[in-house]
């Protein structure tokens, strides 16, 4: 049963995030450099600032093929003082939307010389052994205090949501 609050969406989102920070939980923003994840990041920065819990943990999976402007934007975000940015490189196959003859693209393929990659990750990027997206936000990578939970904040538009 839905229970409507007497709040707008912005205020409700900030209050919910702030309550997570105040309770000592770990909050990690899943970031792509797109509009949805940027909104989530900005909401978390506001909430973490109010709760005095900066910097905000941010994780991004480098997919190698990015528009140059998106790559540059992600680099700027990574340098923000209110952000603790985890730029991860998971050498894994992803769906190749650019070539119908080859359904998968191997991200920063370790079998190739680095010079053959579409672009190089930044020097501070961390290569991870895991080959699946579920490994990006784990208790091992983002440890919490005893009894606390790690929450992943992911931007997803209502039209794209299964529920």
Residue ranges and their predicted role:
Residues 1-163:
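ATP-dependent adenylation/nucleotidyltransferase module used to activate substrates
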């Amino acid at each position: 049963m839905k229970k409507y609050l007497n709040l707008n969406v912005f205020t409700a989102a900030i209050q919910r995030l702030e309550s997570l920070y105040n309770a000592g939980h770990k909050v990690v923003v899943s970031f792509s450099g797109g509009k949805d994840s940027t909104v989530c990041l900005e909401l978390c920065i506001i909430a973490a600032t109010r709760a005095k819990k900066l910097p905000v943990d941010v994780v991004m999976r480098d997919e190698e093929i990015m528009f140059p402007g998106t790559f540059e934007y992600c680099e700027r975000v990574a340098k923000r003082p209110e952000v603790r940015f985890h730029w991860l490189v998971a050498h894994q196959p992803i769906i190749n939307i650019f070539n119908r003859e080859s359904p998968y693209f191997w991200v920063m393929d370790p079998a190739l010389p680095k010079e053959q990659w579409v672009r190089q990750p930044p020097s501070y990027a961390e290569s991870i052994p895991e080959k699946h997206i579920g490994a990006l936000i784990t208790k091992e990578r983002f440890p919490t205090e005893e009894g606390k939970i790690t929450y992943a904040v992911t931007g997803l538009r209502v039209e794209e949501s299964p529920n």
